[in-house]
């Protein structure tokens, strides 16, 4: 067999393997979960080793995106030293490790192989839509693919799933062959977008269609007809059912919507934190620390703006490098039209959501970049080099598999196993703390968590309760005030504080300690002032979102405080 034919056959094999990888990864929750990222990292390491072995070399091009990725990974690796939660911060490195490995993989591929990957996006999106939409009629499966009646697909999150479907439309619009088949695919993807109820993606879809109509003249009429047909079908659905929460949700688009006001509230709260912490709070630091700076009612893991998210995670420098790399590619004249459109869609939506936490979307982002840019360094596949590479890759894969097992145990609610395998995994430790059977066990678990993270109200609550059971009411007050600082908008925290103080006051009364009883009575009377202080710091935006602050004591509590104020403890 001729050498050229053998080489072509080899290229076809690894091209098909990579296409299968790219096709299937979105089915694993879009690679959102950390355990999925760990498994993906192992698969990418194997693919890289296979390619390097076939090509007898490793090609690395130092460009702006590689620099930004290395800075991001370095940031996630270093932030545990000063992070809000050192144990969770380390997971950020493994969460985004597949992104760097995928970019390295693209550097080993030829232009033809990379081009073929674009069509995998719509095929994957169409398949996911066709498989997940019918589950609305299968009650046992509905919760896995729908949330609040909105299609979340295999991503289990409607907005980012809708973005992925929109990304599938763009390569189909640029196809010159099989146009009828491509239009049918676009119709399925459009239907999927409407089923997600994502208003932002709907607006973005209209903009992309207008862009396509201006640049793809042959598709102008078919695209407009498809969009009009889908909108008409959605309007008919709303007219018949009266339901505007799913397919017809785009009819509720408003600049005053609770969702948009909530996003603005997140940004308003996090910007001072970013300015104050130029090196970030670490992965998940924003989530755990938000009680200390929030000015409204919300509990969100992500800022819903990826640049702000990276900035609060790892600081200014990696974020600016990453933003510059994307902006440079977006504005470059040599950027092909399809890649520019894909990049624009991802960047635009990522400014209002946490799309890049789904590594499948991160991978599409990398497809729009130029892996052949920059100075090339070729690492030859020699015996000493091979041994070093295999040992390094093997060690990294082993760590990823171990962490992946621990994180998967946590995902499956086997928290005892997750905490044994990775003691610094805070979510599982919190579950075990809540399930503690004795004060001693609760205190030990709380102390373990506090060594890494001092920003969780539940941990301080546990410490306060243990102190109360031991009769150490002064320490109880200190711990409970820490809990209030971590969850200032949780009215239940103030009510719990009320009950503990009342218990302390009544205990002191029974023991004949009038002075101490008066002290706890005074602190009881301070609770409305604590609530008023939180009201004073509350942003006007907080009153424009669905979950508004509840900072008034129930009537029976207020009545008790009124009676206490007129008693001997005044």
Label every PLM stretch briefly:
Residues 313, 322-417:
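Long, contiguous interaction/recruitment modules in multidomain scaffold/adaptor proteins
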